[in-house]
């Protein structure tokens, strides 16, 4: 399975977000990871 950093839904292998707008507790960090995943 995917390993995601606690407090985020996008930082790590894959993501655990239900949709693109869901970020988790650490929103600024997750936003950066989400943008990077889209590269």
Swiss-Prot record:
Binding, Ca(2+): 10, 12, 14, 37
Activity control summary: Inhibited by morin and p-BPB.
Pfam families: Phospholip_A2_2 (PF05826)
Enzyme class: hydrolase
Lineage top rank: taxon: Eukaryota
Reaction equation(s) it catalyzes: a 1,2-diacyl-sn-glycero-3-phosphocholine + H2O = a 1-acyl-sn-glycero-3-phosphocholine + a fatty acid + H(+)
Cysteines joined through disulfide linkages: 11-33
Keyword entries, A-Z: Calcium, Disulfide bond, Hydrolase, Lipid degradation, Lipid metabolism, Metal-binding, Nematocyst, Secreted, Toxin
Cross-referenced SUPFAM superfamilies: Phospholipase A2, PLA2
GO MF annotations, alphabetized: metal ion binding; phospholipase A2 activity; toxin activity
Cofactor binding: number and manner: Binds 1 Ca(2+) ion per subunit.
Cofactor(s) needed: Ca(2+)
Entry EC no(s): 3.1.1.4
PROSITE patterns assigned: PA2_HIS
Compartments (UniProt record): Secreted; Nematocyst
Role summary: PA2 catalyzes the calcium-dependent hydrolysis of the 2-acyl groups in 3-sn-phosphoglycerides. Induces insulin secretion in isolated rat islets under high glucose concentration conditions, but not under low glucose concentration conditions. Increases perfusion pressure, renal vascular resistance, urinary flow, glomerular filtration rate, and potassium, sodium, and chloride excretion levels in rat kidney. Does not increase perfusion pressure in the rat mesenteric vascular bed.
Family according to the record: Belongs to the phospholipase A2 family.
Protein name: Phospholipase A2
